[in-house]
Swiss-Prot record:
One of its GO terms (molecular function) is structural constituent of ribosome. One of its GO terms (cellular component) is cytosolic large ribosomal subunit. The lineage of its organism: Bacteria, Pseudomonadati, Pseudomonadota, Alphaproteobacteria, Rickettsiales. This is Large ribosomal subunit protein uL14. SMART domains: Ribosomal_L14 (SM01374). Binds to 23S rRNA. Forms part of two intersubunit bridges in the 70S ribosome. Belongs to the universal ribosomal protein uL14 family. GO terms for biological process: translation. CDD domains: Ribosomal_uL14 (cd00337). It comes from Neorickettsia sennetsu (strain ATCC VR-367 / Miyayama). It holds the Pfam family Ribosomal_L14. Part of the 50S ribosomal subunit. Forms a cluster with proteins L3 and L19. In the 70S ribosome, L14 and L19 interact and together make contacts with the 16S rRNA in bridges B5 and B8.
């Protein structure tokens, strides 16, 4: 469950390392896997596609704690940065993702680029 002001890791090679959630799409209070949120880049590498302080959209690919008591639990909260057309800014995805991205949310490209997909 991701709320506003949550610091998240970035799971792609766009250049950002840490982002801050500043908005959740829709009228929801929390975001889960597959939801699109608005983030601000807080920490990044010097040579990258994004810069610190820039605002982007992102899709949640891993969460530490789920609202339902399911078996798959990840070790961190992570997102993949998107542009305005909901396409990935980076070209690679690091770490595991959940199969909910492919099945329910329509982000099949992220699932296919990830290192491991959990059911």
């Amino acid at each position: 469950m991701i709320k506003k002001e949550t610091v998240l890791d970035v799971a792609d090679n766009s250049g950002a390392r840490k982002v801050l959630c500043i908005g959740i799409s829709g009228s929801k209070k929390t975001a889960s896997i597959g939801d699109v949120i608005t983030v601000s880049v807080k920490k990044c590498i010097p040579v990258g596609k994004v810069s610190a302080g820039s605002i982007h959209r992102a899709v949640v690919v891993r969460v530490k704690k789920r609202s339902s008591s399911s078996i798959v639990v990840f070790g961190d909260n992570a997102v993949v940065l998107l542009n305005k057309q909901n396409e990935m800014i980076g070209t690679r995805v690091f770490g595991p993702t959940d199969s909910l991205l492919r099945r329910n949310k329509g982000f099949a490209k992220i699932s296919s680029l990830s290192q491991e997909v959990f059911q």
